[in-house]
Amino acid sequence: MRVSDFTFELPDEMIAHYPQPQRSGCRLLSLDGETGALTHGIFTDVLDKLNAGDLLVFNNTRVIPARIFGRKATGGKLEVLVERVLDDKRVLAHVRASKAPKEGTELLLGDNESLKATMLARHDTLFEIRFDDERDVLSILDDIGHMPLPPYINRPDEEADRELYQTVYSERPGAVAAPTAGLHFDEPLLEALRKKGVEMVFVTLHVGAGTFQPVRVETIEDHIMHAEYAEVPQDVVDAVLACKARGNKVVAVGTTSVRSLESAAKACQDELIAPFFNDTQIFIYPGFEYQVVDALITNFHLPESTLIMLVSAFAGYKNTMNAYQEAVAEKYRFFSYGDAMFIRRNPFACKEKIS
């Protein structure tokens, strides 16, 4: 299967650089995976698409202000993007500089270069950095870090992004990108869903910068997926099994919830799903057989990305590419701050032939 099979033309003006004034006020394109039928609406229509007893699975990760600017003590400017917090003093990070810092290099970080740090070691493309400060890593990032807006949002981060690029239910700091499908849920919508009898549980997957990396191979089977840490606790497992037993739908809010649930199912030997606390490198593309997720709420994704491949595996390749063509024609807003889709799984997608 070729990466180029997943391309589509997207005018620049359809990339959303700011969210809608009201979280739940975005447009919603609904796709019935089994029939391919498309319907247009607004995000609050999800209330009508869910029944009492259905289970919404959210990702409660919280985005950290992971981008720091500074320089080497010797003078060269650099940009640090924290990928993973190792402990109270150390992080793994991407470093962009004219010349990569060597082991032992002293760094001066922050807009006023007030924070001293040391480059301890290099691990492939990531740098292990120690913050030489009495504060813990998360406090430091909160003080001097910038929100790590995706590369396709062509503007500097603003103070408002600290709230807007965060789900209202986020509580586990560690992500460097938001689980963007969840950005559309506000408290009134969540309360209306609860009143209807829709159940809610939370997984945690700390989204890494790898989610924005292009697929650099021609054949998708050759792609090596980046690793992200995920947690699927016992209460989620119990809720999923109970939902399936009563014949209701498990609805994943975002591709990160999909990857968490399906990772837990894949790692399980005897049951449908079991608790999971580990890194996952699950790569979902057409031919993948979903075990857990019945419906998916997701934003529109980049051409040739692993995420549009995941959606194609869920809804069917032809259905997905047709839906994206329709979204472009109808001028939907794309990517992190854009509009959303509600997709019912296509049970035949794993058998679909892609020419």
Curated annotation (Swiss-Prot):
UniProt organism field = Photorhabdus laumondii subsp. laumondii (strain DSM 15139 / CIP 105565 / TT01)
Q: Explain the purpose of this protein.
A: Transfers and isomerizes the ribose moiety from AdoMet to the 7-aminomethyl group of 7-deazaguanine (preQ1-tRNA) to give epoxyqueuosine (oQ-tRNA).
Q: Which reaction does it catalyse?
A: 7-aminomethyl-7-carbaguanosine(34) in tRNA + S-adenosyl-L-methionine = epoxyqueuosine(34) in tRNA + adenine + L-methionine + 2 H(+)
- Under Enzyme Commission nomenclature, its number is 2.4.99.17
Could you confirm whether the keyword Thylakoid appears in this record?
no
Q: What is this protein called?
A: S-adenosylmethionine:tRNA ribosyltransferase-isomerase
Q: Tell me, what is one Gene Ontology molecular-function annotation carried by this entry?
A: S-adenosylmethionine:tRNA ribosyltransferase-isomerase activity
Which family, according to the similarity comment? Belongs to the QueA family.
Q: Which gene encodes it?
A: queA
> How does the annotation summarize its subunit structure?
Monomer.
Q: Which SUPFAM superfamilies match?
A: QueA-like (SSF111337)
Q: Which GO terms describe its biological process?
A: queuosine biosynthetic process; tRNA wobble guanine modification
* Domain of life, source organism: Bacteria
